Amino acid sequence: MIIRSPEPEVKILVDRDPIKTSFEEWAKPGHFSRTIAKGPETTTWIWNLHADAHDFDSHTSDLEEISRKVFSAHFGQLSIIFLWLSGMYFHGARFSNYEAWLSDPTHIGPSAQVVWPIVGQEILNGDVGGGFRGIQITSGFFQLWRASGITSELQLYCTAIGALVFAALMLFAGWFHYHKAAPKLAWFQDVESMLNHHLAGLLGLGSLSWAGHQVHVSLPINQFLNAGVDPKEIPLPHEFILNRDLLAQLYPSFAEGATPFFTLNWSKYAEFLTFRGGLDPVTGGLWLTDIAHHHLAIAILFLIAGHMYRTNWGIGHGLKDILEAHKGPFTGQGHKGLYEILTTSWHAQLSLNLAMLGSLTIVVAHHMYSMPPYPYLATDYGTQLSLFTHHMWIGGFLIVGAAAHAAIFMVRDYDPTTRYNDLLDRVLRHRDAIISHLNWVCIFLGFHSFGLYIHNDTMSALGRPQDMFSDTAIQLQPVFAQWIQNTHALAPGATAPGATTSTSLAWGGGDLVAVGGKVALLPIPLGTADFLVHHIHAFTIHVTVLILLKGVLFARSSRLIPDKANLGFRFPCDGPGRGGTCQVSAWDHVFLGLFWMYNAISVVIFHFSWKMQSDVWGSISDQGVVTHITGGNFAQSSITINGWLRDFLWAQASQVIQSYGSSLSAYGLFFLGAHFVWAFSLMFLFSGRGYWQELIESIVWAHNKLKVAPATQPRALSIVQGRTVGVTHYLLGGIATTWAFFLARIIAVG
C-alpha cells in the first residue's frame, strides 16, 4: 500500500452539450461514415451499413468519443433488458395461471402464453392442469417469483409497470450522457473509482438489498406458502416490512430488533440466517434461509472490497502498482504495461470480461440443477433442461466473443514498439510452442476419446460385450471424479463442520429428495460411460481453444503472412497472386471457432439431457421405488456411437416427430423449419462467390431485357459476408432444432 499526497479536490469530469441532438442526421442511413452516407451504388452498401453501424472504431479514432458511444449504448442495452423483463412480468400478470400454480405447483404446469384462435392454432393451448389451457413455459419465472414472495397477479402488473419506467429512465440516461453531460476520457480510465463503485454499489449494496428483501418479504411469505396457507390470506409485503410483530410471530428473535447485532450476539439471528446445506424437502429447492445468509455474507465481502482502492484520499491499492509488482520467474517484466493496455483498449478489457463472464455463466448452468435455488424448480424437468442448455449456449458464445475481441485488440490496439519482454510479448514470442503443443493435445484427445467409442462399437457389432469398455466388462471408472464427489459428500463431518448437509445432493451421501412423487435430486453416480463422454468434452473444448487462441496469437503476423496486421481484422485472402492465403484472418478464426464451440456445447447438453433422464429424473412410488424416465439406460447405451444415435437421438426424437395434431405440434414445425434453416446455411458455406456473381449477371441481363433493372447494382456477397450468413444460419438452425427436440421430449415425458 502506498500513501501519496491527495489529488487536487475539484475535477471537472464531464463536457456539457458536446453533441447536438439531431433527428435529421440520424434519419440519414450511414451518417457515421462518409462512404456509406453517400448512399447505395451496389447492394454491398446494405451489408457495409450493418457491419459498421456499431463498429465505433471505424467512425472515429478519438478514444474519448468511442468511450462515450459505448457508454451510451450500454444504457440503450439496459433499456431493452428492462423492456424485455417488463414483458415477461406483464405476461405473468395478464396471460398466466400463476395464482393457480402457486396453490398447487406439483400438479399444475406453469403457463404464461395463450394462443389466439385464428387458423386453428388454439390446438397449441395444452391442458397444464387446474383447468387452464395454454403453452407450458420453461423459463423458471414462476419459481423465481414464488421465491421473491410474489403472491398475486396484481404485484406482477406493478412490477411490469416499474420495469417500463426504468426502461424509459435508461433511454433518457443514454441520451443525457452523450448529448448533455458526456464524461471525459479520464472518467472512463479512473479504474480505482470504478472498482470501488461497482464492487460496493452494484455487488455490495445490491446483494445487501436482496438479502434484506429475502429476510423481510420472501422468507415469511414462503413460510406461509409452504404451510399451505392460501396466497390471498397471506399479509402483503409492506405489512411485513412495516410491522415487526408480524415477523416476530414467525421468527421470535425479530422482536429484539437490532440489539443482538450491536451486542455481537449474532447467533440470535440463526433462525432466519441458516447454514444448513442440502435441499428443503417441501419444495426441493435450496433453503431460502441459507440463500438469505449467503447474500448477506456476499454483501459484507463486496462492501469491504469496494473500499480497497485508492481514490481521492491517498490510501488503498493502486491497480497500476499491483500489476507492475506482479512478476514471475519466467515472465520477464511480468504484468508491466498491462495497466496501459486495459485503460486504452476497450477491446482488451472486453475480452477479459467476456472470458470471465462466459466461464461464470457455464458455472451457473452446472449449479442450477445441482443446487436448484428456487422452490419447485428441481421437479420442473422442462425448466431444468432449458436453464442448463440456455446457460451453456450463452457461456459458449461469450467465450468465443472473448477471443474475437482479443484478436481485434491485437490488430487495432496493440503497439509492438512499446511492448518489450512483458507477459504478452513473452507469450507472443513462444506462440509456436504453445500452438504446436495444443495441437498435439487435440490430436491425442481426439484419437483416444473417439477411439474408445469406436472400439466399443466394433466389439458390440462383433457380439463381444465382454471385451467392451463398460461398467460390466472392462471398467474405466472416473476415479478422480468419484474421489471429489466423496470428499464433498463427507465434508459436513470433516472440512465443513458447521454445515449439516453437503452443498449438493449430487455429490452423494444423502437420501434422494422427492416432491409430489417426482425426484428433485439424488446422488448422481458416475461410471465408465461418463468417463468416455468427459474425454469427448475435453477434446472439443481443446479444439475450440486451439482455433481461437491461434487466431489471437497470429492475428498480427505469421510466417505465411508477415504483414497480417496491415490487412485488418477480417480479410478474405492476401491479395491476388498469393494462393493458399485465404481464411487466415483473425475473423476467420472466430468463424471456425464458432463451429467447434457448437460441437462442444452440443455434446455437453446431450450428455446432461440423457444422464438426468436416465439416472436422476423420474417418479417415486409410495413404497419408495424410483422409476427413471429412461430406466437407467445411460451407463450401457451411451458407451457406443450407435447407442447415442439409437437410444438418445432417435428414441427421444419420437415425441417431436410424432407431435403433429397435439399441443406440442409447434415443436414439430420448429424441428422441421430449423432443420431447413440449418441446411440453408450449407448453401453459403459450400459455395464460391464467383458462382453467384455469374448467376447474378445472367439475372440482371433478363431484367435489362424487360427494362426493369434497378438503379442499385446487384453484387454477390463478399466471401466474408457469405461466411457470416452461413455461420449464423448454421448456429440458429442447430440451436432451434435442439430446442424443439429437447422441449417436445421433456414436456411429453417429464
From Swiss-Prot:
Note the topology in the membrane.
Multi-pass membrane protein
Instruction: Give me the reactions it catalyses.
Output: reduced [plastocyanin] + hnu + oxidized [2Fe-2S]-[ferredoxin] = oxidized [plastocyanin] + reduced [2Fe-2S]-[ferredoxin]
Binding residues for chlorophyll a': H675
- Which enzyme class? oxidoreductase
Q: Which PROSITE patterns match?
A: PHOTOSYSTEM_I_PSAAB (PS00419)
- Describe, as the record does, how this protein assembles with itself and its partners: The PsaA/B heterodimer binds the P700 chlorophyll special pair and subsequent electron acceptors. PSI consists of a core antenna complex that captures photons, and an electron transfer chain that converts photonic excitation into a charge separation. The eukaryotic PSI reaction center is composed of at least 11 subunits.
The entry assigns this protein to a family as follows: Belongs to the PsaA/PsaB family.
Q: What is this protein called?
A: Photosystem I P700 chlorophyll a apoprotein A1
Q: What does UniProt list as this organism's lineage?
A: Eukaryota, Viridiplantae, Streptophyta, Embryophyta, Tracheophyta
